[in-house]
Amino acid sequence: MWGSRAQQSGPDRGGACLLAAFLLCFSLLHAQDYTPSQTPPPTSNTSLKPRGRVQKELCGKTKFQGKIYGGQIAKAERWPWQASLIFRGRHICGAVLIDKTWLLSAAHCFQRSLTPSDYRILLGYNQLSNPSNYSRQMTVNKVILHEDYSKLSRLEKNIVLIQLHHPVIYSTHIFPACVPDGTTKVSPNNLCWISGWGMLSADKFLQAPFPLLDAEVSLIDEEECTTFFQTPEVSITEYDVIKDDVLCAGDLTNQKSSCRGDSGGPLVCFLNSFWYVVGLANWNGACLEPIHSPNIFTKVSYFSDWIKQKKANTPAADVSSAPLEEMASSLRGWGNYSAGITLKPRISTTLLSSQALLLQSIWLRIL
C-alpha cells in the first residue's frame, strides 16, 4: 500500500504500496469472546437500503467507530474482518470476513490453483509474523469463483467466495464486515478506508513483522474516474475499464493507493454507525510517485444477490471429515506469489488495441 500518509494498523508505522506496470500488463499477481452492540444494521436511510435477512446478523462493529484523525496509530482491533490469503505458505492477497464461515476476495487471486487445500486464511492478525492469542489460521473448504469471471478478461466479475471448514469465534480481533445489498448507495463524503499487507514500492516488499497498513480514501464518480484511464490511442469506448460491477476510490492529494498484495482486500465505508465492505481491491493504475490514478474495486453491492444465492445453495462443511484447526503460524516471507492487476493510464509509450491484446496474451502464458 502506497501513500504519504498511509497508517499502520498496529504498533509500527509504515509506508504504502507502489506498483509499476504498462498498459494492460498484468503483473504477477494477495479468544476472548466479544459481543458488540446487539443492534442490527439500520433498516432504512437515504444512503442505505434494507438488507433483508442479512440485517439480522451482527456485523460491521469495531472498538473504533467514526473518524480517526490524522496521524493516530490504529490498534489491532481496528479492522477485525481483515484476512490474509495464504498460498502454499506465502501471503498473496487480502480477503474480508463476512460471517463465521465465509469470506470475499478477488477471483484473480486464485489463478494458480482452485484446490482449497493449497490455501489458508489468516484472521485476527495485525502483524503477519507475530500472531497473537487471538490469531487464527483457518483451512479452506470451498472456493467459488463467479461463473462469468475469465482469466482472459480479469477485470470483470472479479469476485470469489471462500468457505472455511470451521466457523470462527467472534472476538474484538475477528468480526465480519456488513455486506451491502444491491440498492446501497454510498455518497462521496462517506468515511471509507482501505487496508492490506501490500508492497511498499514496485521492488520493495513489506518487511517483517509485516504490519497491516491502512489509508483513508474517497469515492470517485464514474465519469471522473474514466478520465484517468484514457490515452490518445485507447479511448474509453474501445476499452471500457469502468464497468457496472466496479467502483473507483483513492486519494491523489495525499498519494494513497492499494497495490500488489492488497488485491481482494476490503474497501470499507462507515454507513449509519456500521462498517460495510463496499469494494474489494481489484486493479489499479501504476502508482509510481506521483500517483496519477485512483484504484478500482469490485463493487460488492452489485454481487449481493450472487453472494446470498451461493451461500444459501452451498452446504456447510462436514466438520467430521474436516482437518483440525491449525496453530496460527508466523509468516516468514512475503514472496513473489503476491497478486495484483495494474493498468497504467496516460503513458507516453502507447499501445494500439491489437498490441495490447497480444501483450496481454503473452503475460497470461507466463503467469
From Swiss-Prot:
This protein's source sits in the domain of life called Eukaryota
Range of residues in the leader sequence: 1-31
Keywords assigned by UniProt?
Cytoplasmic vesicle, Disulfide bond, Secreted, Signal
This entry carries the following GO cellular component terms, namely: acrosomal vesicle; extracellular region
| All copies of domain Peptidase S1, residue ranges | 68-312
Report the locations given in the UniProt record.
Answer: Cytoplasmic vesicle, Secretory vesicle, Acrosome; Secreted
The entry lists its GO molecular-function terms as: serine-type endopeptidase activity
Protein family according to the UniProt entry:
Belongs to the peptidase S1 family.
Q: Any remaining note in the record?
A: There appears to be no human ortholog of this protein.
Q: What does this protein do?
A: May play an important role in the sperm/egg interaction; released during the acrosome reaction.
What name does the UniProt record give this protein? Inactive serine protease 39
Name its species.
Mus musculus
Gene symbol?
Prss39
